[in-house]
Design a protein with these regions (language model features):
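Exposed, low-structure sequence patches enriched in small/polar residues
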Residues: 1-189
Length: 189
């Protein structure tokens, strides 16, 4: 399986009159390729491996983001499942971080996300997810944990409960900007 796409958010398109659109200066391209293994074996019903890539540009032609991810999924014989996703972001520039200033470049980032879940066809099921991402220069990281439980008393009704915890310390926070000798400067903490 494969998919690809192109997203264009033009600065000329006036959607921000209501104030919801943070950035309209964006051109995004993405590509996903997935291989599926549909023939059951002794231990799984189906599995898949995938690769994804996307880039983001602004309307000045600057490459602002480059991201690659590798993912896999296994549906076991008992219909439980396990997933893994690894992400590599060698380039992260954000135009809006300095609030009107130049682009801000974050350091390279790598992450891994794992999940496992019980059979969703059963009346009760549970899913557990863990994620960890770390910037190369140790200025950003996050760790996330979540668990969800489902109960389906009838075919027409399903009840779910999910709780999660996320810790995302950032050593790069915008404080303010100023001007000295006609040169703009930005203060980060």
């Amino acid at each position: 399986l494969y998919s690809g796409g192109f997203i264009w958010r033009s600065p000329e398109l006036e959607l921000n009159d209501v104030g919801f659109l943070r950035q309209a200066d964006e051109i995004r391209q993405y590509l996903d390729v997935k291989g599926q293994f549909l023939t059951p074996t002794d231990w799984y019903r189906g599995a898949s491996l995938g690769f994804g890539q996307f880039t983001t540009y602004d309307f000045e032609g600057n490459l602002n983001r480059l991201q690659f991810d590798l993912n896999g999924n296994v549906n076991f014989k008992n219909n439980w499942e396990a997933n893994i996703r690894m992400i590599h972001k060698p380039l992260i520039n954000i135009n809006t971080y300095l609030r009107g200033g130049p682009r801000w470049r974050f350091s390279e980032e790598n992450g891994i996300f794992l999940s496992a879940g019980s059979d969703r066809r059963k009346r009760y099921n549970v899913n557990v997810r863990i994620g960890k991402s770390q910037a190369k220069e140790d200025n950003f990281s996050f760790t996330s944990y979540s668990i969800s439980m489902g109960y389906q008393p009838t075919n027409a009704l399903r009840l779910s409960l999910e709780t999660s915890y996320r810790n995302a310390p950032s050593k790069t926070q915008y404080v303010t900007q100023g001007n000295f000798l006609n040169k703009n400067f930005y203060i980060l903490a």
